[in-house]
Regions:
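Cofactor-binding loops of NAD(P)H-dependent oxidoreductases
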Residues: 56
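Proteins that catalyze or organize thiol-disulfide redox chemistry
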Residues: 1-22, 27-50, 59-63, 67, ...
Length: 105
């Protein structure tokens, strides 16, 4: 899907992106989160020039999850110019998610 990159901060990565960033807040133990993997791969394939997808493990980055008030998994947050503009909790089918995101890009 995407390559892992190191950033000094999450905010730096968001503000440095020239396209909107869809952040997938997940946990390895979360079954619905695992269901999102192929869905996000399809989204990435169809919207790769218009969107960047980043996965954040809420177990490793609990402070980020808390900062963005993540209380359910999976939660997708769309950021534009470093600011959260849309939030989706739970699993959506790829076509539904793509249609929803296209209306926001």
């Amino acid at each position: 899907m995407t390559t892992k990159k190191q950033f000094n901060s999450f905010e730096e990565m968001l503000s440095g992106s020239d396209v909107p960033v869809l952040v997938d807040f997940y946990a390895d133990w979360c079954g619905p989160c695992q269901m999102m993997v192929p869905i996000l791969e399809k989204v990435n394939t169809q919207l790769k020039d218009r969107l960047r997808i980043v996965k954040i493990d809420t177990e490793k980055y609990a402070a980020l999850a808390s900062q963005y008030q993540i209380s359910a998994l999976p939660t997708l947050v769309l950021f534009k110019q470093g600011q959260p503009v849309n939030r989706i909790e739970g699993v959506l089918q790829a076509d539904q998610l793509i249609q929803h995101l296209q209306s926001l890009l």
